């Protein structure tokens, strides 16, 4: 086993797609814009919620209603991010095993900071996930290594003996930029072929398989 496990959040630990799509479509409808399908939203996520809305809103950042629509999304999502969101099957058991073995664990997400903190505290608590880093104005988001470096600093450890776990190409690039291996999960927002095309080397089909991957 590794010494330190850094996890992505959406599509890796938590199934968040339905709540993200609901808030996205609420904001779009509120501003007279066409709705997006669940599959479209699945493709839009991974680079933070601002990028999600940039992709969902017609003409993106050039739309004069972009800022209002984005704020409508944020406000709705903070009220509704627990409506259907839940850990994937096997995630809680896997995190408890890591805790039992004395492993260091953090979450590093491109989800905005307040939502990352709220969701991690609600579902996992400080015992299972003592460090949770979300998107903030003062630090570059993934795939830049900055948020991973900050998580390692808060865990009082280094990239040596650490592994990054995620469900997307952004996570593969983040791991590479952070100088650590990546475990790609197959239950998230991207499929196996997509992950392999983007450089995935270690793939797992269930959370408990993460525990079996050796350094």
In which residue ranges do the predicted regions lie?
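Active-site neighborhood of HAD-like aspartate-dependent phosphohydrolases
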Residues: 1-43, 54
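Short, acidic loop-to-helix structural element flanking the phosphoryl-transfer center
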Residues: 79-107, 113-117, 145
């Amino acid at each position: 086993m590794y010494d330190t496990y850094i996890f992505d959040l959406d599509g890796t630990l938590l199934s968040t797609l339905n709540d993200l799509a609901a808030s996205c479509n609420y904001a779009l409808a509120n501003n007279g814009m066409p709705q997006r399908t669940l599959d479209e939203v699945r493709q839009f996520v991974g680079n933070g919620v601002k990028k999600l809305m940039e992709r969902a809103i017609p003409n993106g950042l050039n739309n004069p209603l972009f800022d209002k629509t984005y704020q409508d999304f944020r406000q709705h999502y903070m009220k509704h991010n627990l409506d259907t969101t839940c850990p994937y099957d096997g995630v809680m058991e896997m995190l408890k095993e890591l805790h039992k073995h004395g492993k260091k664990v953090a979450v590093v997400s491109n989800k905005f900071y307040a939502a990352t903190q709220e969701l991690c505290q609600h579902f996992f608590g400080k015992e299972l996930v003592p460090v949770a880093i979300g998107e903030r104005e003062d630090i570059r988001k993934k795939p830049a290594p900055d948020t991973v470096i900050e998580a390692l600093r808060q865990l009082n450890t280094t990239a040596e003996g650490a592994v990054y776990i995620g469900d997307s190409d952004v996570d593969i690039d983040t791991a590479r930029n952070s100088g650590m291996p990546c475990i790609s999960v197959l239950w998230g927002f991207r499929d196996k072929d997509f992950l392999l095309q983007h450089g995935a080397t270690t793939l797992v089909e269930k959370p408990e398989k993460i525990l079996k991957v050796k350094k």
